[in-house]
Amino acid sequence: MLKPLGDRVVIELVESEEKTASGIVLPDSAKEKPQEGKIVAAGSGRVLESGERVALEVKEGDRIIFSKYAGTEVKYEGTEYLILRESDILAVIG
């Protein structure tokens, strides 16, 4: 499994609906990049200049909303993930 460093998290993307509310099927070219995901791994936190480590506010299993163009896409063992910093996370769902 991927283990992120510092204040980074690894998320699995949650795909958006392929149909609109009225039943129109959207082609891949019309879909926007997902902005929702589930955290599958979290780093140990960021280190302050004093050397003190600050734990992350999010944890494994959290569903999150993140900035549209944030993170780095990676493919690991056939699954696509996104690695991003905690500061790119906008909200935790639920």
Curated annotation (Swiss-Prot):
One of the record's GO cellular component terms: cytoplasm
UniProt cross-references to CDD domains, sorted A to Z: cpn10 (cd00320)
Induction: By heat shock.
Swiss-Prot/TrEMBL GO biological process terms: chaperone cofactor-dependent protein refolding
Location in or out of the cell: Cytoplasm
UniProtKB keywords: Chaperone, Cytoplasm, Stress response
Source organism, top-level taxon: Bacteria
Pfam families: Cpn10
Record-linked Gene3D superfamilies: GroES chaperonin
MF-aspect GO terms: ATP binding; metal ion binding; protein folding chaperone; protein-folding chaperone binding; unfolded protein binding
Database matches in InterPro entries: Chaperonin_GroES (IPR020818), Chaperonin_GroES_sf (IPR037124), Chaprnonin_Cpn10_CS (IPR018369), GroES-like_sf (IPR011032)
Chief subcellular location: cytoplasm
Function of the protein: Together with the chaperonin GroEL, plays an essential role in assisting protein folding. The GroEL-GroES system forms a nano-cage that allows encapsulation of the non-native substrate proteins and provides a physical environment optimized to promote and accelerate protein folding. GroES binds to the apical surface of the GroEL ring, thereby capping the opening of the GroEL channel.
Binding partners and assembly: Heptamer of 7 subunits arranged in a ring. Interacts with the chaperonin GroEL.
NCBIfam families: PRK00364.1-2, PRK00364.1-6, PRK00364.2-2, PRK00364.2-3, PRK00364.2-4, PRK00364.2-5
Annotated family: Belongs to the GroES chaperonin family.
Protein name: Co-chaperonin GroES
